[in-house]
Amino acid sequence: MRHGNGLRKLNRTSSHRLAMLRNMSNSLLEHEVIKTTLPKAKELRMVVEPLITLGKKDNLANRRLAFNRTRDRDIVTKLFTELGPRYATRPGGYLRILKFGFRHGDNAPMALVELVDRPEVEETAVVAE
């Protein structure tokens, strides 16, 4: 039975919550790592993981479903050309949520949300001489 398995409301209206989760999922799929609060991160996982599962099988119906959920052509392209093949053999668990301390001001628990197996980017430090 699925009693009590509803969504977190996050103190927002349903339209605001939908828009916020859509924006956060687009940012995560574009940058592959974002920083947010822990409850938002846990809700974001319920949105992004099915999207990546859609991206594993590239057909027109799945592309239309992904566009309906993201409303961004560039994200849909990346989802089906990069992320789908990257996670083709992984049966779920595409996100990693790391606790990241507490926010100054309201002491909200923060978290880093990142895609598992993302390519490491070498950061070049700019040295001022």
UniProtKB/Swiss-Prot annotation:
It comes from the Bacteria. One of its GO terms (biological process) is translation. Gene3D superfamilies: Ribosomal protein L17. It holds the Pfam family Ribosomal_L17. Keywords: Ribonucleoprotein, Ribosomal protein. Part of the 50S ribosomal subunit. Contacts protein L32. This is Large ribosomal subunit protein bL17. It comes from Polynucleobacter asymbioticus (strain DSM 18221 / CIP 109841 / QLW-P1DMWA-1) (Polynucleobacter necessarius subsp. asymbioticus).
